Amino acid sequence: MKRVFNFSPGPAAIPQEVIQQAADEMANWRGCGLSVMEMSHRGREFTEILATTKDDLRSLMSIPDNYKILLMQGGAIAENAIVPMNLVGMKPQPATIDFVNTGHWSIKSIEEARKYANVNVAASSEDQNFTYVPARDTWKLTPDAAYVHVCTNETIGGVEFDFTPDVGNVPLVADMSSNILSREIDVSRYAVIYAGAQKNIGPAGLTIVIVRDDMLGHALPICPSAFDWKLVAEHDSMFNTPPTYPIYIAGLTFQWMKRQGGVAAMEKVNIAKAKLLYDYLDSTDFYVNNVPAANRSRMNVPFFLRDASLNTKFLTEAGQNDLVQLKGHSSVGGMRASIYNAMPIEGVQALVDFMKAFEKKYG
């Protein structure tokens, strides 16, 4: 069976072992005579899948007992509305939300939050085209803010937080859609973590929300019941029918990660993959990456050919070498290699080898 190296930013590569196991179990999950896709979400079989998936995620991330794991729908885009609808009610209205703006996805969160609260952009890297993370001592926070929001990895700009910010007693909320499970973090430093699944966890359609217990029960009256975290938690993520098959694939991915050695092992490999690609980019003038080393993303590596007229040739010839989905986002152009957990280091080496050959041919 032919497989290519898929550098898509999302939906992204899924571990080959996971795809093979899902294929083997497609028509008959563990001898029950059913595909997971046709199981009742309240049946014994899926209840087992759901419980195991949540337990494995809790184990992988060392999630404390006073946090709920919610398996929802709508992606991080929906959570941009769901988060404020669940949290601004903790403060007298109109509440204020503090944001750190590091790029495209931060801006999406800011724009949506304005519908529900006052927004204070406490820090921004727009002055340098979103190529860095503002130092914590430059943030101008609101003392009584409902929460502080950060996007820990910007997929388009290739910028990633390399620290967990101290925001005092104000709840810290993080969109970790593109770097969840890629590096070790202390979950207890965050009040809420949310992530679309389609980058490091599984197929599109599932959203992970990790929420501290004291953040529950504050939903605004306008919040739809299906988006009220307290109700979702009370119904064990089954207030409405959950995305059963994406949950199943997420569970297989978590089991795969445990076999690899957990998040610590993933982080070690991710550091090696990123170093391999960035070291080459820094060694040549043929390609360029504009992000300072301290803020470079381990997950998404944007780069540009100095001669942009070669872009189409680069993508075409990369595809001929089984290296796909390397086109940069339309807002910035160039190229982008997304090297999430499922991308083996062999894929990054193949990309670097191709880039060297392409430079030799056209440089």
Curated annotation (Swiss-Prot):
Cofactor descriptive note: Binds 1 pyridoxal phosphate per subunit.
Record organism: Herminiimonas arsenicoxydans
SUPFAM superfamilies: PLP-dependent transferases
Co-factor requirement: pyridoxal 5'-phosphate
Binding site for L-glutamate: R42
This protein's UniProt keywords: Amino-acid biosynthesis, Aminotransferase, Cytoplasm, Pyridoxal phosphate, Pyridoxine biosynthesis, Serine biosynthesis, Transferase
Name of protein: Phosphoserine aminotransferase
UniProt binding sites for pyridoxal 5'-phosphate: W105, T155, D175, Q198, N240, T241
Cited PANTHER family: PHOSPHOSERINE AMINOTRANSFERASE (PTHR43247:SF1)
Catalytic reaction equation(s): O-phospho-L-serine + 2-oxoglutarate = 3-phosphooxypyruvate + L-glutamate; 4-(phosphooxy)-L-threonine + 2-oxoglutarate = (R)-3-hydroxy-2-oxo-4-phosphooxybutanoate + L-glutamate
Annotated EC: 2.6.1.52
Chief location bin: cytoplasm
Similarity annotation: Belongs to the class-V pyridoxal-phosphate-dependent aminotransferase family. SerC subfamily.
Pfam families cross-referenced by the UniProt entry: Aminotran_5 (PF00266)
Modified residues (N6-(pyridoxal phosphate)lysine): K199
Subunit relationships: Homodimer.
Recorded GO CC terms: cytoplasm
Pathway per the UniProt entry: Amino-acid biosynthesis; L-serine biosynthesis; L-serine from 3-phospho-D-glycerate: step 2/3; Cofactor biosynthesis; pyridoxine 5'-phosphate biosynthesis; pyridoxine 5'-phosphate from D-erythrose 4-phosphate: step 3/5
Enzyme's top EC category: transferase
Task performed by this protein: Catalyzes the reversible conversion of 3-phosphohydroxypyruvate to phosphoserine and of 3-hydroxy-2-oxo-4-phosphonooxybutanoate to phosphohydroxythreonine.
A Gene Ontology biological process term: pyridoxine biosynthetic process
Localization in the cell: Cytoplasm
GO MF annotation, one: pyridoxal phosphate binding
